[in-house]
Amino acid sequence: MKKLRIGARDSKLSRIQVDIVARKIKQTLGIECEFVPIKTKGDIDKTKSLKDFKSPGVFVKEIELALLSREIDLAVHSLKDLPCEMDSNFEIVAVVEREDPRDVLVSKDGVGFYQLKPNAKIGTSSLRREVHLKNLRQDIQVVNIRGNIETRLSKIESEGLDGVVLAYAALKRLNLDSHVSYIFDVNEITPCPGQGAICIECLKDSPYKNILSKINDADAYIQTQFERLVLKFLGGGCHSSIGVFCKTDQDKIYAFASILSGDKLIKASIEGDKDDFLSLANKLSNMLKS
């Protein structure tokens, strides 16, 4: 079989994620791959806050266009970047790997979150992280920052920040997790749906989707599908304040979610059988609406 062309964002982290997928494809299916880097709108415009982009999928649209034009055979994404309402031409055929989905603080002086000085300035471009940070400490000043992980880390010095909040998974994959000062529990900052997961997206009529599904991690797939369903039922997008975390243990699902309602952060949890994950997701979203 010919080499499979993998389209993904042109960043160091994205290349690492493509390498993870390419290795699994080679080991499991015996097929070679090549990387096709693609610049997305979110990569090009690094000044606008993510919540200010009017259309969803700012990190995926151009990659999906490359799928449609058959310039690439599959796309590799950080699953949290994919809108929960996908275009009918595409589907997620595999969730390949999920790292720790929690958020972390990297602070200037290496101190933990609750040891930060009063009115500390913390950098993030995420509305969800901002809402949760303010819920934990009202004195925190949130500063909007954009850029790749390395750029955001450098802004601690260049912009006089006391710290930045980032995805633990990204730092781990970049071997930068030694910089972590504090790991937020999911009750403190509920992760973005799909955070930490790498997924493969294909056209619905792709001749490769059946073989690529063989590298799917079943537990990671159920966890992330559950999280995305809750987000969908709540009418949220990738850059909303909604956080959802799901873990699986044998035949059970345990989930926790949070949403900003007015000026109050509402939280809810649920557990049940894996087979009932659709109804459980619906129940959890209704608990947050009530």
Curated annotation (Swiss-Prot):
Read off the Pfam families from this record.
Porphobil_deam (PF01379), Porphobil_deamC (PF03900)
> Which pathway, metabolic or otherwise, does it act in?
Porphyrin-containing compound metabolism; protoporphyrin-IX biosynthesis; coproporphyrinogen-III from 5-aminolevulinate: step 2/4
Q: Which domain of life is it from?
A: Bacteria
Please give the residue positions where the record annotates the modification S-(dipyrrolylmethanemethyl)cysteine: 238
What EC identifiers does the entry list?
A: 2.5.1.61
The free-text note explaining how the cofactor binds reads: Binds 1 dipyrromethane group covalently.
What cofactors does this protein use?
A: dipyrromethane
Q: Which InterPro entries match?
A: HemC (IPR000860), Porphobilin_deaminase_N (IPR022417), Porphobilinogen_deaminase_C (IPR022418), Porphobilinogen_deaminase_C_sf (IPR036803)
Any GO BP annotation: protoporphyrinogen IX biosynthetic process
Q: Which reaction does it catalyse?
A: 4 porphobilinogen + H2O = hydroxymethylbilane + 4 NH4(+)
- A GO molecular-function annotation: hydroxymethylbilane synthase activity
Alphabetically list the UniProt keywords: Porphyrin biosynthesis, Transferase
Return the SUPFAM superfamilies for the record.
Periplasmic binding protein-like II, Porphobilinogen deaminase (hydroxymethylbilane synthase), C-terminal domain
**Would the keyword Hydrolase turn up in this protein's UniProt record?**
no
GO CC, alphabetical:
cytoplasm
Which EC class heads this enzyme's classification?
Answer: transferase
Q: Which family does it belong to?
A: Belongs to the HMBS family.
Q: What does this protein do?
A: Tetrapolymerization of the monopyrrole PBG into the hydroxymethylbilane pre-uroporphyrinogen in several discrete steps.
Q: How does it assemble?
A: Monomer.
Extra remark beyond the main annotation = The porphobilinogen subunits are added to the dipyrromethane group.
Listed name of the protein: Porphobilinogen deaminase
Organism field: Caldicellulosiruptor saccharolyticus (strain ATCC 43494 / DSM 8903 / Tp8T 6331)
